[in-house]
């Protein structure tokens, strides 16, 4: 599932990060942000994934995104 295909593994990890935010899964956010960074994701790319999650998840995702931002501080 997370192998390179039509979408790169990096992009799949960014998608999974956004889903983790929307579903409020902290362990998912932690894992997928770390994996996205290992696959070469930049700070800007991760931030844009967070922004998409906030846009799609409205209020609750905004609160959940704070955890993702804390993880990003550790990774960058």
State where each predicted segment sits.
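Acidic, glycine/proline-rich low-complexity segments that act as flexible tails and inter-domain linkers
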Residues: 1-13, 63-76
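Alpha-helical scaffold segments that form or flank carboxylate-/histidine-based iron centers
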Residues: 12-20, 49-56
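C-terminal structural segments of small proteins and small subunits
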Residues: 47-73
